[in-house]
Curated annotation (Swiss-Prot):
Gene designation per UniProt: topB
Listed GO biological process terms: DNA recombination; DNA repair; DNA topological change
Site (Interaction with DNA): W60, W167, R175, R307
Enzymatic reactions: ATP-independent breakage of single-stranded DNA, followed by passage and rejoining
Identification of the protein by name: DNA topoisomerase 3
Keyword DNA-binding on entry: yes
Enzyme class label: isomerase
Function field: Releases the supercoiling and torsional tension of DNA, which is introduced during the DNA replication and transcription, by transiently cleaving and rejoining one strand of the DNA duplex. Introduces a single-strand break via transesterification at a target site in duplex DNA. The scissile phosphodiester is attacked by the catalytic tyrosine of the enzyme, resulting in the formation of a DNA-(5'-phosphotyrosyl)-enzyme intermediate and the expulsion of a 3'-OH DNA strand. The free DNA strand then undergoes passage around the unbroken strand, thus removing DNA supercoils.
Keyword RNA-binding recorded: no
Species in which this protein is naturally found: Staphylococcus aureus (strain USA300)
Region (Interaction with DNA): 186-191
Domain Toprim: 2-135
Length: 711
């Protein structure tokens, strides 16, 4: 009898097979005398669509809403059904005695495996592999400490409740809004509050009125002393009068105070912090950061589990620090890492805190030494950031003397503040940091002359627009960006981690860009006309970050066995009914900002102009019509003059190709040029290359020229 190991991806299955010496490769799995290891391809099973409950629901109609199934159905995803059949056969195989779930150690990973097992009707015992890295050592250690699968039942119930709630709310709210206003509009418990966050910030900026104010400083022996005052001076004349009173008046050093202080490194990275820093440093978006991090985790095995919300490590990891430091010796930080090899680490260090680690600890290097030449430029940047933060956390604090010199002149107090580094500590890892020396020439009681007075003009600045990094942080801490009626709600938002999860926030932002609810201009995220109208048309409670936080709080309670999933789902059903009825009874109107005067050839309604990756197209405003029409698109045909790609306008014989250089030619001329160029002889390789490149494009001249050739 054998144990069947179910991994989430083929790459992880290969890692497990390698770690456990499961060497016999089969079709869709690996095998040895003790284990069989197979894999999902992400989700193999998903929630059924409305039309899979009732074929009449394929057409979107307002009168059919709300759609609330008595029992939720799941279906096998068509494109991965072959692998599902393989997994199913293995689960039901008589030689398999039990199942070891080895999907990602988290809510979504649990759902991936359990949906498959439930769909198959598994009755065999379940064990759980729960690890935070996929190195050979971590896998082998994890298999020595397999858990009873029943310990994770509540995690599964929470994952299933989240999935079903999102389906019930999302399907109904989106269909209701879309059919009510004849527009492709989408609502969701996470995406709609995120639009509201961006909109609130945008309104704050638009309503901001800058205020002018002034500051005064004195220069003494080359040092600038700032006027100490509890008020902001908005009247320049007040400071000018003060300057007049200071003329020909000497000052006196009232005190020189030195206080020794320490500063400590930032917390270890969680996913959100890492995504934010990658955008701040390199303008790399959250989605790209997560994909790169996943590659470092799965392919290179040099970092721990990516989707974590913790900034801390567990105390049982203390003994692993040395081998992780050893791995970082391959980086440019080897000189800073080397002294740490002789240091003794204690579980009392601030980075170790079991209470602040739930599913996964902070993102840190594994014990695997990276082959730096194998890392892409983006992977290298990300790995360096993780190593830098990790080594800083293990280094001594930065120490400095905070010097405060107080000057009195004509009854006014001016202050000079300087920090003098005495011990670099963790800051030694940063380029350009060094020990500083300040030969400050002041002693208490000194009489000093003022060499210069400076009145500086300032202006208050509005809040900054969100970028992809700061929006992530706002989703994590929305209580810092919105006004709440009750302070207790701020605590709720803080405890639940805000809107969405570390694993989903990047996807939500990406989705909002794709549905044209938000846009980024020069790195500034703004709400589009469509996004603003979604907020106006959506039920008010669905735009609030508080509601989704309260839901997330209940999901966490389900995960901990303190709330019934069934109760939560019933609450979501009642909420959905209210949302749908509210939309049905609304008298608000939706105005397309991209509506054209072109009539749809199918239904006669006016069409909407939308941007695509390669150009523009017209789409019928009625979502049930689905008529589309190309307006313009980039082709692979090249301009004969400047060799740039030509843009195709129109269709059929009316089509025209234009270039940015001014060149233009008709479809007939293009056909003739391509035919002449080919001379009736085209290699099979060239034909395949162009046919694949232009697959699905209408009016493709090269494709047309090739299709009748006999090869």
């Amino acid at each position: 009898m054998k144990s069947l190991i179910l991994a989430e991806k083929p790459s992880v299955a290969r890692d497990i097979a390698d770690a456990l010496q499961i060497n016999q490769k089969r079709n869709g799995y690996f095998e040895n005398n003790q284990y069989i290891v197979t894999w999902a391809l992400g989700h193999l099973v998903t929630n059924a669509t409305p039309e899979q409950y009732d074929k009449n629901l394929k057409e979107w109609r307002l009168e059919d809403l709300p759609i609330i199934p008595k029992y939720m159905k799941t279906v096998v995803i068509g494109k991965t059904s072959k692998q599902f059949k393989t997994v199913k056969a293995l689960i039901l195989d008589n030689k398999v005695k039990d199942i070891i779930i080895a999907t990602d150690a988290g809510r979504e990973g649990e759902l991936v495996a359990r949906l498959i097992l439930d769909k198959v009707g598994n009755k065999k015992p379940i064990r759980r592999l729960w690890i935070s890295s996929v190195t050979k050592k971590a896998i082998q250690q994890g298999f020595k400490n397999l858990k009873d699968g029943r310990q994770y039942n509540d995690l599964y119930y929470a994952a299933l409740a989240r999935s079903e709630a999102d389906w019930i709310v999302g399907i109904n709210a989106t269909r209701a809004l879309t059919t009510k206003y004849d527009a492709q509009l989408s609502l969701g418990r996470v995406q709609t509050p995120t639009i509201q966050l961006v909109n609130t910030r945008q309104q704050e900026i638009n309503q901001f009125k800058p205020q002018q104010y002034f500051t005064l400083s004195l220069t003494v022996k080359g040092f600038d002393f700032q006027l100490e005052s509890n008020q902001r001076y908005t009247n320049k004349e007040t400071l000018e009068q003060m300057v007049n009173n200071l003329k020909n008046v000497d000052g006196k050093i009232k005190s020189v105070a030195t206080k020794h202080k320490k500063s400590y490194p930032q917390s270890l990275y969680n996913l959100t912090d890492l995504q934010q820093d990658m955008y701040r440093r390199y303008k790399i978006g959250p989605k790209e950061t997560l994909n790169t991090l996943q590659s470092l985790y799965e392919r290179h095995k040099v970092v721990t589990y990516p989707r974590t919300d913790s900034n801390y490590l567990t105390t049982d990891m203390v003994d692993t620090m040395k081998e992780r430091i050893q791995a970082t010796m391959a980086t440019t930080y080897k000189d800073q890492a080397r002294p740490l090899m002789s240091k003794t680490f204690s579980s009392k260090m601030s980075i170790f805190n079991n209470q602040k680690v739930s599913d996964h600890h902070a993102i840190i290097p594994t014990e695997v030494r990276p082959v730096m030449s194998d890392l892409s430029n983006r992977e290298l940047k990300l790995y360096d950031m993780i190593v830098e933060r990790f080594l800083e956390a293990l280094m001594p604090p930065h120490e400095y003397d905070a010097i405060t010199v107080t000057l009195e002149v004509a009854g006014h107090t001016f202050v000079l503040k300087e920090n003098v580094t005495t011990v670099l500590g963790f800051k030694s890892i940063r380029q350009g940091e060094s020990i500083t020396e300040m030969q400050q020439p002041f002693s208490e009681g000194d009489e000093v002359k003022i060499s210069k007075t400076n009145i500086r003009e300032h202006e208050t600045t509005p809040p900054e627009y969100f970028n992809e990094g700061s929006l992530l942080k706002a989703m994590e801490n929305p209580q810092n960006f919105i006004q709440l009626k009750d302070k207790k709600y701020a605590q709720t938002l803080k405890q639940t981690g805000g809107i969405g999860t570390v694993a989903t926030r990047a996807d939500i932002i990406d989705k909002l860009f794709n549905m044209n609810a938000i846009e980024s201009r020069d790195g500034k995220i703004k709400v589009t006309s469509k996004g603003k109208q979604i907020l106006e048309l959506a039920p008010e409670e669905l735009t609030s970050p508080l509601l989704t936080a309260q839901w997330e709080e209940k999901l966490l309670l389900i995960e901990r066995g303190k709330y019934q999933a069934k109760t939560f789902i019933n609450e979501m059903k009642d909420f959905t009914k209210d949302v749908v009825n509210g939309i049905k009874n609304s008298d608000r109107k939706y105005k397309h900002d991209n509506l054209t005067t072109t009539e749809c050839p199918t239904c006669g309604k006016f069409m909407i102009k939308v941007k695509t990756k390669n150009g523009q197209m017209l789409v019928c405003q009625d979502p049930s019509c689905k008529t589309k029409k190309n307006v313009q698109r980039k082709t692979n045909a090249r301009c004969p003059n400047c060799k740039k790609k030509l843009t195709l306008f129109g269709k059929g014989k009316e089509a025209v190709y234009r270039c940015v250089c001014g060149h233009s030619e008709t479809q007939a001329h293009m056909d003739q040029r391509m035919k002449s160029k080919s001379s009736g002889k085209v290699s099979r390789k060239e034909m395949k290359k162009y046919m694949n490149k232009n697959e699905g494009l209408d009016n493709n001249p090269f494709k047309d020229a090739l299709k009748n050739l006999n090869l």
